[in-house]
């Protein structure tokens, strides 16, 4: 927006005026103001992205209500941008997790991978057809996939999820991502924001990545991942990439991203006003860009400090100590 651009230009002017190395106090103020602007900018843009993705999923819901594709639940903003920080000032990627529920006549069975590890990375989602004979008799909106002849099903009903987005009996990440990407391309014109943004679907085998450009040539990068919830927990089997060289398309690694974003939102309500925990995270994340050190490891360390350090110790005067 114009306001964002004006604030950014004002900050740049202050930075150029404050380059006297003897004036450390002014530089500290400029840095603090810069980080505060970045955090506020992330919050406002995150809200824009959430609204846009919500409208997109609403179109999906309307057009796929009678299908046998996965049921898409409201997206959950995850990752650094929705936690209030980012290792990058430009080209921030706004990540969202779209929970999947089984369509009618299907159930999901989560087969967790190797036990005993901190994060299970080789889990699968088995798709099983369930009997809907009672529904067929009472509602009459579908034929039972289990007890009707294949020929009748082929003639009178769309294919089951097993025949569209699965490999064998398992939900396929890459087929799901490609299906979603193709649907976004065809459904975008119906989304209200299509009048304000030019949309491009970027290559991705395990998610849906969008590049949105407005009339001012400002760009938003959005990545939608998919996940199936483990019971009532905040742990999901997700489509996110792993560090492995090769990840089978039927592999859905565990993700704690939803639990982590909830942790940061909870802490935001507990810490003192003007807490510096996000400023510390933002500063170190920027410093570590290009070093090969994992920003996820850095975030984990800050999360540990937030639970082990008295919350009163995150005030502005504690900034250098916390660093």
Question: What spans do the regions from the language model cover?
Answer:
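N-terminal regions immediately upstream of nucleotidyltransferase
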Residues: 1-94, 98-170
């Amino acid at each position: 927006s114009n306001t964002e651009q004006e604030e950014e230009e004002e900050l740049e002017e202050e930075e150029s005026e404050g380059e006297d190395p003897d004036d450390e106090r002014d530089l500290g103020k400029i840095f603090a103001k810069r980080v505060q602007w970045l955090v506020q900018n992330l919050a406002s843009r995150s809200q824009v992205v959430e609204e846009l993705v919500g409208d997109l999923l609403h179109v999906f819901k309307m057009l796929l209500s009678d299908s046998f594709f996965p049921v898409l639940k409201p997206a959950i903003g995850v990752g650094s941008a929705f936690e209030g920080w980012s290792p990058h000032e430009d080209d921030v990627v706004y990540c969202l997790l779209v929970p999947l529920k089984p369509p009618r006549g299907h159930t999901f069975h989560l087969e967790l991978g190797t036990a005993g590890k901190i994060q299970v990375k080789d889990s699968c989602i088995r798709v099983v057809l369930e009997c809907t004979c009672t529904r067929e008799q009472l509602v009459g909106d579908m034929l039972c996939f289990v007890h009707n002849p294949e020929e009748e099903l082929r003639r009178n009903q769309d294919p089951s999820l097993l025949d569209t987005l699965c490999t064998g009996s398992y939900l396929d990440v890459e087929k799901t991502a490609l299906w979603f990407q193709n649907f976004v391309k065809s459904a975008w014109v119906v989304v209200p924001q299509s009048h304000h943004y030019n949309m491009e679907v970027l290559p991705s085998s395990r998610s849906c990545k969008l590049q949105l450009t407005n009339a001012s040539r400002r760009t938003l990068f959005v990545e939608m991942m998919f996940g199936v919830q483990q019971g009532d927990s905040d742990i999901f089997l997700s489509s996110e990439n792993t560090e492995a060289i090769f990840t089978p398309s039927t592999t859905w690694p565990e993700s704690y991203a939803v639990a982590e974003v909830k942790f940061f939102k909870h802490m935001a309500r507990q810490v003192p006003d003007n807490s510096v925990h996000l400023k510390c995270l933002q500063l170190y994340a920027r410093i570590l860009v290009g070093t090969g050190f994992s920003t996820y490891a850095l975030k984990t360390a800050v999360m540990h400090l937030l639970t082990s350090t008295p919350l009163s110790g995150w005030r502005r005067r504690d900034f250098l100590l916390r660093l």
